Amino acid sequence: MSKVTQIAHPLILHKLAIIRNKNTGSKDFRELVEEVAMLMAYEVTRDLPLEEVEIETPICKTKCKMLSGKKMAIVPILRAGLGMVDGMLKLIPAAKVGHIGMYRDEETFKPVEYFCKMPQDIHERDIIVTDPMLATGGSAIDAINALKKRGAKSIRLMCLISSPEGIKAVMDAHPDVDIYVGDIDERLNEHGYIIPGLGDAGDRLFGTK
């Protein structure tokens, strides 16, 4: 069964409040999304396996713990998921980055895939799918479907804010995928947008309409 983790760290909630503010411009919005992604990545990677290694300090030899070299991949859902990648790469710079492009049909609210490019060994990697907003859950579900078709077995989903409906939809469709969110909002409105939300994350990241 999926595990849902709300990473309610004071720094994350503070930065999310600024991100939500309609008066926050694209430059600050981009920087804050990157910062929150980096802070969240700290928790998302908490259970990475460690191994004991021997190193030599300027004083003596000693044993320390280091990451065991498990392969990782970050897969942003385009466009908005791109804004979270650089923050995560600061903590896990060896991760490879795949891309899934989706847009939402404004009439059906359903996602349409238009691009997918993955590392050749994606099936061997622990994958973190990124999208700032988990609204209906449709894009995340389809992105995870696309990864599983390519043999992926270890997948986590990381979002800045989510709706209860989106969380339930992903859990029902993919009970093996753990979900990490910065904040859980009230609900979706009749147009499928998160309330109170933060607007269109892609438009606010890139200054488009």
Swiss-Prot record:
Allosterically activated by GTP. SUPFAM superfamilies: PRTase-like. Its EC number is 2.4.2.9. Keywords: Allosteric enzyme, Glycosyltransferase, GTP-binding, Magnesium, Nucleotide-binding, Transferase. It catalyses: UMP + diphosphate = 5-phospho-alpha-D-ribose 1-diphosphate + uracil. Pathway: Pyrimidine metabolism; UMP biosynthesis via salvage pathway; UMP from uracil: step 1/1. CDD domains: PRTases_typeI (cd06223). It comes from the Bacteria. Uracil binds at I194, G199, D200, A201. Its cofactor is Mg(2+). 5-phospho-alpha-D-ribose 1-diphosphate binds at R79, R104, D131, P132, M133, L134, A135, T136, G137, G138, S139, D200. One of its GO terms (molecular function) is uracil phosphoribosyltransferase activity. NCBIfam families: PRK00129.1 (NF001097), upp (TIGR01091). PANTHER family: ADENINE PHOSPHORIBOSYLTRANSFERASE, URACIL PHOSPHORIBOSYLTRANSFERASE, CHLOROPLASTIC. Catalyzes the conversion of uracil and 5-phospho-alpha-D-ribose 1-diphosphate (PRPP) to UMP and diphosphate. This is Uracil phosphoribosyltransferase.
